[in-house]
Amino acid sequence: KTIRWFERNAPNDFGLYGRKWNLSGRLPTRFGALVHSIEKKLPFNYCSFPSWKGVILNKQDVLMNSRFSIVYENIKGLNGYITEKIFDAFAAGNIPVYWGANDINDYIPKNCFIDRRNFSNHEELYKFLKDMSEVEYLNYQRCIKNFIENESEEFTCKKFADVISLKILEIINN
C-alpha cells in the first residue's frame, strides 16, 4: 500500500530499489518460475512498479543520498523482532520510517526514527516528512549518532554470538 500511495501521490519523492520488483507478484512455485523466466526475456522491461529504479549493488549508495527510508519489517507486531533494516538506514545517516516490532522503543530510542504507527494514513506521514525542518532532521541524526556510539551494544555481532553460544550451552547442559 505504501509503495502504491507514493507512486500515485509523490512519484518524484519516492524510489523503489531491489531485486525482483520488476517481476510479477508471487505465483505458485513452478508456474511462477516459468512466468519469471519469460518476463526476463521480454524485449520490453515489464515492471508493475513504476517507481522501481533497478537493482543496486550496495544499498548504502542509495540510502546515503536519501533523507528518509521506508523501513517496514516483514513481520509487524512481533516483540523484539528488529532486523538490520533500521541499522542500514542509521549507518547511512538516513532517517528511517519504521514499522515493525511493537516494543521498538524498548531497544531503540524514539527520537532515532519516525514511528509509522503515529500516522493514521500516508498523507499525514508524507506531510510530516515534507514539513520537517532542517533543525529537526539534524536532531534525528544527532540522536542516531548518540545511540550508535553509546547504546547499540545489544545489536552487535559479538552480542549476537554470545546469545547463540549461551543458548547452545543451555541446550547441551539440559
Task: Kindly give the residue locations of the regions a language model identified.
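Nucleotide-sugar donor-binding catalytic core of glycosyltransferases
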Residues: 1-114, 136, 151-152, 163-173
